[in-house]
UniProtKB/Swiss-Prot annotation:
Keywords: Ribonucleoprotein, Ribosomal protein, RNA-binding, rRNA-binding
Function of the protein: One of the primary rRNA binding proteins, this protein initially binds near the 5'-end of the 23S rRNA. It is important during the early stages of 50S assembly. It makes multiple contacts with different domains of the 23S rRNA in the assembled 50S subunit and ribosome.
Biological process, per Gene Ontology: translation
Annotated family: Belongs to the universal ribosomal protein uL4 family.
A Pfam match: Ribosomal_L4
GO cellular component: ribonucleoprotein complex; ribosome
Membrane among keywords: no
InterPro entries recorded: Ribosomal_uL4, Ribosomal_uL4-like, Ribosomal_uL4_dom_sf
Location of the region described as Disordered in the Swiss-Prot/TrEMBL record: 53-85
Protein name: Large ribosomal subunit protein uL4
GO MF term list: rRNA binding; structural constituent of ribosome
Organism annotation: Novosphingobium aromaticivorans (strain ATCC 700278 / DSM 12444 / CCUG 56034 / CIP 105152 / NBRC 16084 / F199)
Entries under PANTHER family matching the protein: 50S RIBOSOMAL PROTEIN L4 (PTHR10746), LARGE RIBOSOMAL SUBUNIT PROTEIN UL4M (PTHR10746:SF6)
């Protein structure tokens, strides 16, 4: 699959880039993408802190007060949730959200996410060489008209000037190739890859 290389303002750049069909030419499957996104979001969740319940608190278990004639309820011990210092009724318990997912399924999900963006209009730029000026980058992206949410993926590391210029632009996010993931790719309107990012991603699956 050949894609025209563009400049950051959306104009035609130099030459074309050949995208591997093994990475960018798959037919996306909703069930695979759903499994990978669910796995990602579950792994982001923190572990809930356990609350001390009635059996966990250290209070006397001796019955206080008489059974009859005291004019009060027939309480058995001070651990009951209605007392100050008593256990929590139906409190939160420790839950592990780190579900496992086969590496091959994760890799397949990422390739399908890239393929879905390739079908929708993947953008490839030569590089991210810009001045570290937010105003200038905003003007370029406005001309390109890539949508409200744009994910830009660079090669080994993100270009410093581009990262500085883009960090205050709402809806523009930047990642190195090693950070490419299904959730971030799917939640953006447009995926922009540099030549270096294409090489890194293809080497990631073919290496």
């Amino acid at each position: 699959m050949k894609v025209q290389v563009l400049n950051l303002d959306g104009t035609a750049g130099k030459g074309e880039v050949e995208l591997s069909d093994d990475v960018f030419g798959l037919e996306p499957r909703a069930d695979i993408l759903h499994r990978v996104v669910t796995w990602q979001l579950e792994n982001r969740r923190g572990i809930a802190r356990k609350a001390r319940e009635r059996s966990d608190v250290a209070r006397t278990g001796k019955k206080f007060g008489r059974q009859k004639g005291g004019g009060t309820a027939r309480h058995g011990d001070r651990k009951a949730p209605i007392f100050i210092g008593g256990g929590k009724a139906h409190g939160p318990r420790v839950r592990e959200f780190n579900i496992s997912l086969n590496k091959k399924v994760r890799a397949l999900g990422l390739k399908m996410a890239l393929s879905s963006k390739a079908k929708a209009g993947l953008v490839v730029v030569d590089n991210l060489d810009v001045d570290a000026k937010t105003k200038a980058l905003v003007g370029q992206l406005a001309k390109a008209n890539w949508g409200k949410k744009v994910l830009v993926i660079d090669g080994e590391g993100v270009n410093d000037n581009f990262a500085k210029a883009a960090r205050n632009i709402v809806g523009v996010n930047v990642l190195p190739a090693i950070g490419a993931n299904v959730y971030d790719i799917l939640k953006h309107d447009t995926l922009v890859l540099t030549r270096a990012a294409v090489e890194k991603l293809e080497a990631r699956f073919n290496g």
